[in-house]
Every structure is written in structure tokens, then in C-alpha cells.
From Swiss-Prot:
This is Phosphoenolpyruvate carboxylase. It comes from Pyrobaculum aerophilum (strain ATCC 51768 / DSM 7523 / JCM 9630 / CIP 104966 / NBRC 100827 / IM2). InterPro entries: PEP_COase_arc-type, Pyrv/PenolPyrv_kinase-like_dom. It comes from the Archaea. One of its GO terms (molecular function) is magnesium ion binding.
């Protein structure tokens, strides 16, 4: 079975506004110009037309692309536990109807997989499998889709504490698939880093990702199950950094073991095509999966210290988030934001959250300053940096956008002390981008946020 390597997504992480009406052409350009072999049609928290999977299939087939063989359309549907039930069911129907069209037009199955976001229990997955089967069966009775065609679910696991237990979760997922009548030998698992970083901080989410990829590699070596991991990462280090032209090589090595990686919006719209090609080459390089030990205690401590660090600023970040524009047809984060469990904080979704910290003068990767200091004090920093070898390069990159003046004015002096101490521990002398910092220190509107994002090469 052919497994795609590059998944083009509709993340609102670019400074360029893309409307839902432009996304069909965007998908075809991703196939033809960017070398992506999979396009995610996104319904999670997003007002995407239900005809879009079918429309992408129509345009791709008209251009002679081998849809269903080397090119795929993969919708991400709303989790019915978290969003409107009706939207979840309609997006599943859109996936099945896209296959009805592609089978009638070309005898191929355009949609082989559907992504289920925020997968934290097997019951929701079983429910969605049942809904998919019911919709496919109804269309088969109308001779609108082949009876032997089925769509597999890709669980999207987006929390560090779930990712570190991924081995047992995968076994439960295979049992759930079997109970739905699917005897699988292979499954694609989507590991997301962005929402995990919002909840737990960058270093906790990165350590959990490395640990999860290691566990999946062991599962594949054992041979009982075959897993193809997808890593969902963007351009900022806080969101994985894999799409960042300055960081793609060290990040690809750090997260070795993935089969598929996302190609998000910023790397296609906010950097040059030549820089995109560097990112693509780095992602497609084959790195040997890493065999190393990551202590759960590090992840727990990093999460604890991150939450402690951001606690005083949650209200201010929610206020500043009004300056961050939406560059896709998204549902407002105030309707569909993120709750950090255990503390009941409602915060913006990952891209707006990330962009807002930059707007406050503090690149969010630097919010792990206290964990850096803790690891150093406990003689664990070398071990942590072996697990996360891209860390120093990430902090050097982020230093270009760190403004002490802006941070002190917006958030106060305590956070600046922590960050400066961590830079000293890592042996990094910040080298701020003077043009960027000058603009940032007087920024207060959405046009400022857009201009700053263009300098960085991403919105958030």
C-alpha cells in the first residue's frame, strides 16, 4: 500500500488570507507545484464547504492526476465529542460522497482516510467508524458507491500525556477497528505537537513526541502491528519547527521515525519557493529512528513549570489575541478554543496563541526557561539536550524575535529574568532582528501583527 509522505494542510498559520473558495485550486497547486501527495480538507473548527472534497477530486481527475493511487484527499472531520454533532456527520458524508463521485468518474477511491482530531478515547473512534459505515452502506444501496470500499480513520493524538502511552493506546485502537469489522494489519497514527505545546509547553510536547515515535518504532520492529506515523508540525519551533527553512534539518533528525509530515500554509506562502524546496528536501530525507530513553518525569516537570510560568499572563494573552487576524475561514477561538486541563484556562487555539506570544515580545519556545534552569540545576540538561538536539538552534532562532522592552512593558520583569537566565545557561547571546524589534515595540494592530509575521516567515 502506498503511504503519502507530504500532507498539504489548511492551517491558518500564514500571513496570507486564503478563502474557502480558493482552497480547491490551492489543493491542486499543492499536488502539482509543491510535490504533496496528500491534501487535508479541514472541517475542524473551520467553515469549509461540504462539497470541497468532491470539488478537489473533480479538478484533480480533470488534470489527469492518479487520484487514489499516488494522490489522496484526506478530510479532517470535527470530533463529535467536541464540536457540533451535525457538522461531524456532514463532513463524514462529504468524504463518502467524494468517493461516490471519483468511483463514478474514474473508478478510483479518492478518500482512503479520514482524520479524527483530539482522539483521547476509543469510544469516539468506534462511534465515528459506525457513522462512516452507515453512510457508505446507504450510498451502496443506491449504487452510488462500491460496497467493498471503506474509509479508515486516522486518530490524531494531540496531548503529551496520551502520546507517552501511545503503545497501549495503539493496541486499543486496533481492537476498536476489529470490533467495527475492520481487520487491520496497518494503521496511520497522527501525532500533533501544537495543541500539546499549548497545554504543556514546547519541551514537554517535544519530549513526548520523541518518546512516542520511539515507541512506534519498537512496535514496528516487533512486527505484530504496522504503524505509519504522521507528524503535524508548523514553522515556529513551538509548533515543531519542521516547516521552518532555518530549522528543518535539525528538526527532521530530532523527530526521525515519521512516515508523513504536514506541509502547512506558512511554508507555502510566507517564504520563497527555493526555501520551501529546502524544507521539502529535509523532510523527505530518511533518518534512522532514534533509540533513546526519555524519562516521563522530565515531561511532567516541564509541563508543570510551563503552566506555572504562564499562569499570571493568561488574561493578558487572551486580550492581546484580538490583534491576531484569521487567515482562513475559521470558527472563532472564543467558540472553539482550548482548555488547559487541571486549571480550566480557556486560551486561543495553537496558531493564534503562538502568534500572540510573539506579539507580546516573548517567542513561546522561551516559556520553557524555568525547565532549562531546573534541568541544569539537577545535572539533567545534557540528557535533555541529547533527547532534543534541536533546542539550541531553536533558541538562537527565537532570540531574533525576543524583545525585553516589549516583554517587560506587556508582561512584567519576572518572565524576562527567567528567559535571560536560560539564555545564559545555554550559552546563547541573543541577536535580535533590529527591524523586527523596532516594529514590535510600537505594534498594537492587526496590520502590525501581519507585518511582524512576514518578517518571521509565519503568523503563528
Amino acid at each position: 500500500m502506498y503511504i503519502p509522505c507530504l500532507m498539504c494542510t489548511q492551517h491558518p498559520d500564514s500571513t496570507v488570507k486564503i478563502t474557502a473558495g480558493e482552497e480547491v485550486d490551492e489543493a491542486v497547486v499543492a499536488f502539482l507545484a509543491y510535490g504533496c501527495d496528500e491534501v487535508m480538507v479541514d472541517y475542524e473548527g473551520k467553515a469549509t464547504p461540504y462539497s470541497q472534497p468532491r470539488d478537489v477530486a473533480s479538478k484533480a481527475l480533470a488534470l489527469g492526476l492518479p487520484l487514489g493511487e499516488r494522490f489522496f484527499i484526506t478530510p479532517r472531520v470535527p470530533n463529535p465529542r467536541l464540536e457540533d454533532f451535525e457538522r461531524s456527520m456532514l463532513s463524514l458524508e462529504a468524504a463518502v460522497l467524494a468517493n461516490s463521485y471519483s468511483q463514478r468518474a474514474a473508478g478510483v477511491q479518492a478518500v482512503k482516510w479520514v482524520v479524527l482530531p483530539m482522539t483521547e478515547d476509543v469510544e469516539t473512534m468506534a462511534f465515528v467508524y459506525k457513522a462512516l459505515d452507515m453512510k457508505a452502506r446507504d450510498l451502496a444501496e443506491l449504487n452510488a458507491v462500491k460496497r467493498d470500499s471503506s474509509i479508515e480513520l486516522i486518530p490524531l493524538v494531540e496531548d503529551a500525556m496520551r502520546q507517552i502511552k501511545i503503545e497501549s493506546f495503539i493496541k486499543a485502537l486496533f481492537r476498536t477497528a476489529a470490533q467495527s469489522g475492520r481487520i487491520l494489519e496497518h494503521m496511520r497514527i497522527f501525532l500533533g505537537i501544537s495543541d500539546s505545546a499549548v497545554r504543556h509547553g514546547h519541551m514537554a510536547s517535544a519530549l513526548a513526541m520523541v518518546k512516542a515515535l520511539g515507541q512506534i518504532s519498537e512496535i514496528n520492529r516487533d512486527g505484530e502491528f504496522k504503524i505509519s506515523p504522521i507528524v503535524g508540525m508548523g514553522s515556529p519551533p513551538f509548533r515543531g519547527g519542521l516547516n521552518n527553512p532555518h530549522l528543518a534539518v535539525p528538526e527532521a533528525a530530532q523527530y526521525a521515525g515519521y512516515k508523513t509530515a504536514t506541509i502547512q500554509s506558512a511554508v507555502r506562502y510566507d517564504v520563497s519557493y527555493a526555501e520551501y524546496q529546502k524544507v521539502r528536501e529535509a523532510i523527505l530525507s530518511v533518518y534512522t529512528p532514534r533509540r533513546l530513553h526519555v524519562e516521563e518525569a522530565w515531561i511532567t516537570k516541564a509541563s508543570e513549570l510551563y503552566r506555572e510560568a504562564i499562569r499570571p499572563y493568561i488574561g493578558k494573552i487572551a486580550e492581546l489575541a484580538n490583534a491576531i487576524p484569521s487567515t482562513r475561514d475559521r470558527v472563532s477561538w472564543r467558540e472553539y478554543g482550548r482548555v488547559i486541563e487541571g486549571v480550566e484556562w480557556r486560551v486561543p487555539r495553537a496558531i493564534v496563541y503562538t502568534a500572540t506570544w510573539y506579539f507580546a515580545g516573548v517567542p513561546p519556545t522561551l516559556l520553557d526557561a524555568r525547565f532549562i534552569a531546573w534541568a541544569y540545576k539537577n545535572d539533567l540538561l545534557d540528557d535533555v539536550l541529547r533527547a532534543l538536539p534541536a533546542t539550541v538552534e531553536e533558541w538562537k532562532f527565537e532570540s531574533r524575535f525576543y524583545s525585553r522592552e516589549r516583554a517587560e512593558k506587556t508582561l512584567g520583569g519576572e518572565i524576562v529574568k527567567d528567559i535571560d537566565n536560560a539564555f545564559d545557561i545555554l550559552g546563547i547571546k541573543p541577536e535580535p532582528d533590529r527591524t523586527y524589534i523596532t516594529l514590535l515595540n510600537s505594534a498594537d494592530t492587526q496590520p502590525h501583527a501581519i507585518a511582524l509575521g512576514r518578517i518571521r516567515g509565519f503568523l503563528g
